[in-house]
Amino acid sequence: MRWYHSQMTQYHIAINGFFWDKPTVGVGQYVHGLVTALATFPDLRITLYVPADTTPPTAPGGVTITRLRSPFSGRSKNMAKVMFEQLAIPAAARLDQVDLIHVPNFAPPLSSRIPVITTIPDLIPLKRPAYRGSLRVRAYTALVQRAARNSAQLLAISTTVADDAARLLGHARGDIDVTYLAADPIYQPDQSTDDIRTRYHLPASYIYYVGGHDERKNVSTVIRAYAALPSLLRQQYPLVIAGKAVGTNPVLFPDIDALIVQLGIAADIHRIEVTRDDNPAVYGGAACFVYPSCDEGFGLPPLEAMACRTAVIASHAACMPEVLGDAALLVDPFDISAWTDALTKVLSDAVLRESLVTAGSVRAAMYSYQRTAAATHAAYMRVIAGQRGQA
């Protein structure tokens, strides 16, 4: 519904806020960054729909949070999520007379009287069989795959994802817009590294990894490459691994602790659970950051490390070359000896390390959520104008 204030047309946008209370995961970071930036557009009135059984963080000024109950709330977590996406949001949007629904993850409603824009963060479940192993997951994937085809507009967070979406969802590539992500503003050089080292029992110098532990993250490659370093170099630069597996399926979540013990390098590896607020300082205290993932939609951690002025070694798979350019040392994700060589070079060559720091800082500054929001706003306006033209 169009609202008028001081002669300005204002459009009502409803956003699926399922991940609003999950700011440490990629989609949650995207939603927070996007909504915060969109709130500065005077021609938008934004309503964020969140599940009724969550305690959502405060929204930016001008953004309304509406809590929606759905069938299965408080009973089945998975079914409650599906009903929230498929029934509660379209119904609320219709009652609220919104102009557009934006679903910022791969979870669009199959049927909606209100036009839907869907952002595709990645299509991992369609590309990698291990991620759709159960019947429930396969059924859900088929549902949202079909629903995505009904979206008025698809957005993708990288050209890599846009190409995947054209191939796997049947959309014309020219109809899919790319809206890049960005590192959150909290990721910048932090002077509190000494305090963080004490709190997390970190060594003076270290190699850092933070991210998922599922199989596509390929953490075992870095562990094996690290084990091949000379023992003196390992002692000088322990490997700090943050995060943990969130499942028990050994195919999806390889046992990296068993691998560490098997390789005899447990004394040189530190396992930590780091908070979001402390993560910038942990990045900043590292000699380098490693990211061996073999499949990503965007890959925020390397960009966060760059924003914190830390040298990055990453895989050259999927979107990594697109996002990181020549500001990171890019390596074949499965070539263990190449990873060992890359680690040796970066740790032993201060000039190379500083050049990566400088290039990375420039690269990270190329991305911002204000740019993401501007591209998203343009998509909103095109879809709304198209709907008005059909009326």
Where are the regions a protein language model picked out?
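Carbohydrate transferase catalytic cores enriched for Leloir-type hexosyltransferases
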Residues: M1-A391
